[in-house]
């Protein structure tokens, strides 16, 4: 990082501490979203949602499912139903639609990892920090792959999924649960790595310093407006910067 970039990063971290009334960080954990941060699965999610809604005769908006990323499935379905039919979906409709979406996702998902994801997780562990997964996903096919691709990194005790919360992102419940699973942490004892606006809102709402990585088609401004303190264009770029971010976090004090 250049001197100017280091200064800017320090200022962003100071602003976070001041806004949230902390004197310093006490970093213990890094909370990771899954889709779009660890796995390049969002194109498959988007395609399967679009096709499912098309088959149901329900209109959807450009990039709607990227913007809705992080919500639990029923909330995503209800948003489309409200706009098209002015009502929520019935339990039976939700079950049918989500089953079809899941079927299509399994066809389209390649299982590819986001470049840099493994390296960032390894770096986090070498620094003695705890990786915690915080995802709105309830897709068994993805959750089951975590142990294959990231052996020993995540356990049920360090994972928050759609099955663990009543209110999906952007409500802060997911990341508040992430703090609990990280060891009953305070917000200044963790940082978040997100890729989605709703996930960013959730993390910021939980009071955690939030880094966004824009791995999708949305403009950076959407993530900044959602509250991200800084936006990177890839996990690779974040990987290059991560040592300096951690160093500043561990030394800064108001």
Please provide the spans of the model-predicted regions.
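Anion (oxyanion) recognition and catalysis
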Residues: 54, 125, 204
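Metal-dependent phosphoesterase signature
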Residues: 15, 81-119, 127
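Conserved phosphate-coupling serine/threonine residues in phosphotransfer and NTP-handling enzymes
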Residues: 37, 135-137
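Asp-based, Mg2+/Mn2+-dependent phosphohydrolase catalytic module
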Residues: 1-27, 122, 138-254
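Short glycine/serine/threonine/alanine-rich loop segments
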Residues: 58, 129, 208
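Short helix-capping segments at alpha-helix termini
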Residues: 55-58, 85-89, 150-155, 184
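Alpha-helical substrate-recognition element adjacent to the catalytic core
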Residues: 47, 52-85, 107
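Active-site neighborhood of HAD-like aspartate-dependent phosphohydrolases
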Residues: 3-64
């Amino acid at each position: 990082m250049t001197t100017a970039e280091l200064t800017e990063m320090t200022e962003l971290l100071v602003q976070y501490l001041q806004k949230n009334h902390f004197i310093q960080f006490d970093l213990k954990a890094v909370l990771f979203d899954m889709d779009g941060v660890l796995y390049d699965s969002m194109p498959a999610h988007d395609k399967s949602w679009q096709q499912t809604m098309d088959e149901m005769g329900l209109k959807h908006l450009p990039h709607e499912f990227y913007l809705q990323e992080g919500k639990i499935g029923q909330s995503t379905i209800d948003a489309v139903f409200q706009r098209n039919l002015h009502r929520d979906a019935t339990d039976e409709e939700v079950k049918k639609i989500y089953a079809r979406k899941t079927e299509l996702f399994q066809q389209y998902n390649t299982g590819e990892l986001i470049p840099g994801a493994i390296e960032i997780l390894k770096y986090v562990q070498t620094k003695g920090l705890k990786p915690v997964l915080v995802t709105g996903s309830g897709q068994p096919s993805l959750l089951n792959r975590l142990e294959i691709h990231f052996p020993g990194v995540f356990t049920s005790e360090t994972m928050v999924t759609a099955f663990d919360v009543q209110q999906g992102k952007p409500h802060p419940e997911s990341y508040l649960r992430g703090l609990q699973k990280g060891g009953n942490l305070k917000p200044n004892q963790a940082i978040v790595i997100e890729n989605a606006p709703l996930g960013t809102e959730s993390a910021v709402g939980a009071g955690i310093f939030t880094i966004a990585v824009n791995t999708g088609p949305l403009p950076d401004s959407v993530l900044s407006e959602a509250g991200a303190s800084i936006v990177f264009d890839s996990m690779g770029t974040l990987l290059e910067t991560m040592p300096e971010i951690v160093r500043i976090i561990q030394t800064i004090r108001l």
